[in-house]
Amino acid sequence: MKENIYDKKSYDLDTSAQLVFNYIKKKFGKREECICFYQEPRYLTQYGFVPSLVVLDREYGIIIFKTYDYKDGDIYYMGEDSWIVKGERIANQLDYLEDYEYELKNDLFRPVNKLKPSMLSINSFIIFPFLNSDTIEQLDETIQDAIENNQILFSDFNIVLNKLESSKMLKENEWKMLRSVIQKANGLSKSLGIKIKEPVKNLRDAITLNENKIYLLDEEQLDAAMTLNNGCERIRGLAGTGKTIVLSMKAARLHALYPDAKILYTFYTQSLYKQINRLVSIFYKKLTGEDLNVDNQNLKIMHAWGGKIKKGVYSEMCKKINVKPLSYYDMRFEKDPFGKACSKLIDKNLTEEYDYILIDEAQDLPVEFFKLICKISKKPYNIVWAYDELQTTGDVKIPEPDELFGKDEYGKAKISLKRDNDHILKKSYRNNIRVLFLAICLGFGIYSKKGIVQMIDKEETWRALGFKLDDGVLKYGNNVIIERPEKNSPMNIQSYYDKYNVLNYNLFDTKSEELDFISNKIITLVKEESVKEEDIIVIDLNSKSAESNLKYIQRVLFKNEIGSMIPGFVDGVDDFFVEGRVTLTTSRRAKGNEAPIVFVLGIENLYTTMNRINDKINRNLAFIAITRAKGWCFITASGEKANLFEEEYYEIFSKFPRMEFKYPTEKEMDEIGKINYMTSNDEILKTSYENKETFLKFISQDPEMLKALLNDDEKEKILKYLERLND
């Protein structure tokens, strides 16, 4: 039996639930297809009723328990209208239980779930494990009937429960649906109520079928989303493992349970605003039956930095202490613009404002921001941060809490992370295994002729990401084999519709041919395959030419009566996935978003420079772009470098699903470390590498970067540049 006790603080004080739970473990403990929830699932009942324990069993159905810790002499009277407990009149608790059971059945037996009352039995009990029935002075006829019918049990409750009999065994799909409903996961469904028959006839139906499939949170995701503890939590996982979903569910759950608590949800990518708001709203309504009030000041969803129009955590801090917020433009010559801006507030008197703080995309935020978060968090620092080791231009390493939040005057970490609160999400549900495998091999440069640009140095970290070391030891210069088990990438959308490979690439002689191919393919998908425009995203890997390339595609689509948008160039930066419009963008703007169909434009950009720093950046951008695909991925390249991608592609998949390579030598790892240092800030590099003068001015102010850059071959050359620049 799986034990899902998420609110451990409450359970530790709930002696009556503990007693009944110990009995349940004896009766159901050895059953594999059985789950016991504590105070779950919750519904917005008229009386705010919460069950003590709910057992979900594939053969026994659903068993609901409400336990009370009343003892002999506590209850004087139990009647149909009210009870007298400890000298006070309270409502008949059977009404509460029946109200809850009614809401549960309404949720279970909605037509979309395809569950019927005849499929499973539902039993519910009120239990007084510390009370003998003969100590109650008065019982009216209604309550006596309930006792005789075993709805109300007392200290001898085990006698009745031992007689519980199993019912009809649920089918596998019914059991999966039952768990999904109880876990609230089907609140994510974007189904329009359209029934799709298999086999599907076009790509749109395949997308709809995939979205209508049950999204069942796995144990790691469910534990991360539902657990409530005092103190901090960390959530780790690859792209597509559900980190944003988990944080959104946690935010909705906290707001539903503690409406007066101050909750902050912050993130790095501006285009995530709509997605996070949508997810939190879906889960909140699922939990409470009410629409989320987006203007509620107790739940704030804000960008980390903020801007002229959008509020941000940093900008709001500044306003509260009458300090002018610094913009990226103000800090553009700093190595870490946002970190430097945050550092100017660290010594200021900031108010401990929030009871709970949730941080998405933690890998992209500077340490100084976390120190500010610590200052605005109330004790015991209920801070949850989600981290993706591979979606950062910096080092593939997760900083520990003492690095993020600092130490106290005694040298101890201000915030400690308990092992049970370090959640690892291994399974990637967004990306097909081939898509994810290609993204990682390209992103790390596993088979790049220029050499590996990024590496994970611990087997434990590889395992945490859902890989396994098949052969070798992670030591300098060793031959190693690392595999991605298929079970950790279960998404297989191509099985619904195999007209297109889930992963495609096309090479062209000229850029115009490449752009025409993408434009025409989109036209075909929309007009012949009935794909919705908002289900398509085009990502250009070359930021220099992105605006002109994307506008070209936009013009072609417009002529064919297909709407599109270009966030940041033509439209607002967070305008993603608007109904009836294809999204045309860059990797940096696409970060954090996803789409059923992704076009990755200009993959030859990986091979246009021999500079190792740019190589690392370009490969990371390719990783981000490819992993946006939660369905089909179309990759294109043009020009004389295009064939280099094809060569690397074939080498990657000749070993699939295993990566066979030589682990970097000590010298190579040192070089990778230098590259990581020099690519540790995405924003400054985005500007600097496109402007040599800006870049040289930037590195002239950073001795560590100069040290990393000035190898024997380039030292003289770069020094001369700097001398001319400073004249």
Predicted features along the sequence, with ranges:
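Intrinsically disordered, low-complexity Ser/Thr/Pro/Gly-rich regulatory segments
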Residues: M1-P51, V55-R204, T208
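Hydrophobic "anchor" residues on beta-strands that sit immediately upstream
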Residues: I35, I62, Y356-I359, V384
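Acidic/glycine-enriched edge-of-secondary-structure segments
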Residues: I84-E103, I235-L238, P325-R332, D498-E513
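Metal-dependent nuclease catalytic cores in nucleic-acid-processing enzymes
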Residues: E98-R110, R619-C633
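N-terminal pre-P-loop "Q-motif" helix
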Residues: K184-G231, L238, V246
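Conserved helicase motor core of SF1/SF2 NTP-dependent helicases
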Residues: K213, E219, E233-D295, W305-K308, ...
